[in-house]
């Protein structure tokens, strides 16, 4: 028993982390390229995903854990290490990274940024649909009622030219 406790006490579990706590911030928004309006979405794992890949940490860069936009299309992460990152968002819009089913690149609209202090990144995207409130939502007897108008945001031709080559 004594030997087990001595070996446990000497292990690396009790050493301090050799890195300072990350203090840099990335924040921004995902907006409609045509209207400038925020892209409204579900919040959480069904919404817009933000993916960071630190490019200057190692040759075999791996993705940081993904995080998600708020329902209004804005995002913020206040615990990032300073460095150069590739930033990408995925959601209900024409994908920023597109390639054929054979892996041939068609487009890469991600952003490479230096994150130091507070860094803002705005993505202008082409949503598949636009959702607009018609009038104001009302509340009656604890029930919220809202009317919305949903319209196609990109033409069929644009969809075919951007998405169909992906397979």
Task: Go through the PLM ranges and name each one.
Residues 92-126:
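Structured interaction patches on ligand/partner-binding surfaces of diverse proteins
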Residues 35-60, 159-163:
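Short, ordered, surface-exposed loop/turn motifs in non-cytosolic proteins
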Residues 73, 81-100:
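A short, solvent-exposed beta-strand micro-motif common in secreted/extracellular proteins
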Residues 55-74:
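Short, acidic Ser/Thr/Gly-rich low-complexity loop/linker segments typical of extracellular
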Residues 24-33, 73:
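A short, amphipathic beta-strand motif
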Residues 22-26, 142-146:
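Structural beta-strand segments of beta-rich domains
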Residues 16-18, 29-45, 153:
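Structural motif
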Residues 6-10:
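C-terminal motif of bacterial Sec signal peptides marking the signal peptidase cleavage site
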